């Protein structure tokens, strides 16, 4: 029962994994295809809007040129916010110069940015930089004279006394001292009791050889079987035996077929075939389009 549950769980996980992989693949392909298409569409929309905006600016500048020309003809001295011509981008057409009466002000660009302001206060000091690279070695000093001897000032090192070493081991025992002087003779004491017996003395020297003994009885010879010796080496092989009786007749049916043999070498390549008939003519191509051409610059409403 547990085995069946495990198999069912594995199948469900297999379907879930397949579904997840499919969704991931579709999402990846969608992102690969949709993002460039969306970017291309947004760029196309931006280009179209830019052309429309430039056209509107051009028409507006033309209207203001007519207005200034009318003021010049009528002799009207006026200055309004739009008296200063703005710089147009994308169109090189020059307009009529403004002929106002009291024009003493300076010109400015279309973005409305004035002259640069005063310099700001100095900023805080930056973090210290990294150490520079080591300099090149200096030039070699002049050689000393041959007869000059080194002095104590030539050596600039100081050798302080070293620390005390560890304590050494005990020395060997000294020789025994001289014998002491004889003690005083005891007075008033009698002889003491006898001491215990001393240890046995060392063995004495060996004695001399004794006289030869009488001859013994004559010996008797007894025969007993000895132990068997090791086996000898193997003898030479004997002559071949007589021929055996003929065997019984075999079955009349042939035996089973043997296994298939190895594949033979590849044959020589065949002769080249005859050339085929010419194919059918292809369908005519589609007419050329104007998708690559920019949209015409027309007035709004067309």
Swiss-Prot record:
Q: Where is this region: Triple-helical region?
A: 114-143, 162-185, 189-221, 226-252, 255-290
**InterPro entries reported for this sequence:** Col_cuticle_N, Collagen
Q: Where is the composition biased (Gly residues)?
A: 91-103
Q: Which UniProt keywords apply?
A: Collagen, Cuticle, Disulfide bond, Repeat
* Repeat is among the record's keywords: yes
Query: Which residues fall in a compositionally biased region of kind Pro residues?
Result: 194-203, 293-302
**Compositionally biased residues, Low complexity:** 137-154, 205-234, 245-281
Provide the assembly information. Answer: Collagen polypeptide chains are complexed within the cuticle by disulfide bonds and other types of covalent cross-links.
What this protein is reported to do is described as: Nematode cuticles are composed largely of collagen-like proteins. The cuticle functions both as an exoskeleton and as a barrier to protect the worm from its environment.
Q: Which PANTHER family match?
A: COLLAGEN, CUTICLE COLLAGEN 40
Could you tell me what this protein is called?
Cuticle collagen 40
Native source organism of the sequence: Caenorhabditis elegans
């Amino acid at each position: 029962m547990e085995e069946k549950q495990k198999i069912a769980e594995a199948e469900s996980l297999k379907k879930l994994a397949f579904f997840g992989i499919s969704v991931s693949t579709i999402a990846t392909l969608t992102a690969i295809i949709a993002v460039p298409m969306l970017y291309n569409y947004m760029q196309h929309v931006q280009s179209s809007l830019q052309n429309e905006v430039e056209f509107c600016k051009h028409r507006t500048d033309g209207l203001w040129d007519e207005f200034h020309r009318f003021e010049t003809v009528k002799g009207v001295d006026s200055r309004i916010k739009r008296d200063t011509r703005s710089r147009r981008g994308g169109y090189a057409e020059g307009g009529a110069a403004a002929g106002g009466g009291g024009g003493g002000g300076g010109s400015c660009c279309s973005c409305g940015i004035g002259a640069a302001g005063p310099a700001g206060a100095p900023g805080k000091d930056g973090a210290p930089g990294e150490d520079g690279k080591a300099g090149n070695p200096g030039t070699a000093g002049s050689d000393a004279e041959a007869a000059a001897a080194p002095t104590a000032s030539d050596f600039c090192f100081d050798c302080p006394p070293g620390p005390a070493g560890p304590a050494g081991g005990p020395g060997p025992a000294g020789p025994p001292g001289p014998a002491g002087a004889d003690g005083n003779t005891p007075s008033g004491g009698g002889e003491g009791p006898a001491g215990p017996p001393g240890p046995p003395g060392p063995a004495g020297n060996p004695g001399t050889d004794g006289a030869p003994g009488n001859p013994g009885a004559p010996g008797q010879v007894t025969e007993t079987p000895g132990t068997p010796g090791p086996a000898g080496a193997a003898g030479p092989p004997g002559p071949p035996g007589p021929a055996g009786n003929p065997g019984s007749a075999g079955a009349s049916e042939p035996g089973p077929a043997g296994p298939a043999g190895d594949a033979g070498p590849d044959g020589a390549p065949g002769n080249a075939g005859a050339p085929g008939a010419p194919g059918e003519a292809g369908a005519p191509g589609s007419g050329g389009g104007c998708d690559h051409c920019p949209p015409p610059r027309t007035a709004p409403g067309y």
